Amino acid sequence: MSIPNHLRYSEEHEWVKTEGNQVVIGITHFAQSELGDIVFVELPEVGATLEANEPFGSVESVKTVSELYAPVSGKVVAVNEELSDQPELVNESPYEGAWMVKVELSDASEVEKLLTAEKYAEMTNQD
């Protein structure tokens, strides 16, 4: 699967899509393929505050449990409730249906510090 150019990426394999003063966050195709079949997703509540580079939830697969790290700081304004009933969406549609949280940014400049698609591809040895 190609890496979408319109997104930014963290070194912990989260993607960020900017929508005005908010961002949508999910995990990358690379991350879900490394994890294997996702069986459970734990996400924060609406209203929770995220701090960049700090854990904000977890993803459980048949192989392991992996923490999710916030690529940016801000307040959670929406959570993808579908993932509690259909965690497999993370495997099936990591960049669309399986977004995890929407966050109102506290510092928009944090987005610019994230990796471009090209840099993320280099980091993960994907073309």
Curated annotation (Swiss-Prot):
Span of domain Lipoyl-binding: 22-104
Highest taxon listed in the record's lineage: Bacteria
Modified residues (N6-lipoyllysine): K63
GO BP, sorted A to Z: glycine decarboxylation via glycine cleavage system
A Pfam family per the record: GCV_H
Note accompanying the cofactor annotation: Binds 1 lipoyl cofactor covalently.
Cofactor(s), names only, from the UniProt record: (R)-lipoate
Keywords tagged on the record: Lipoyl
Cellular component terms per the entry's GO annotation: cytosol; glycine cleavage complex
Assembly and oligomerization: The glycine cleavage system is composed of four proteins: P, T, L and H.
Role this protein plays: The glycine cleavage system catalyzes the degradation of glycine. The H protein shuttles the methylamine group of glycine from the P protein to the T protein. Is also involved in protein lipoylation via its role as an octanoyl/lipoyl carrier protein intermediate.
PANTHER family hit by this protein: GLYCINE CLEAVAGE SYSTEM H PROTEIN (PTHR11715), GLYCINE CLEAVAGE SYSTEM H PROTEIN-RELATED (PTHR11715:SF3)
Family: Belongs to the GcvH family.
Name assigned to this protein: Glycine cleavage system H protein
Species in which this protein is naturally found: Bacillus cytotoxicus (strain DSM 22905 / CIP 110041 / 391-98 / NVH 391-98)
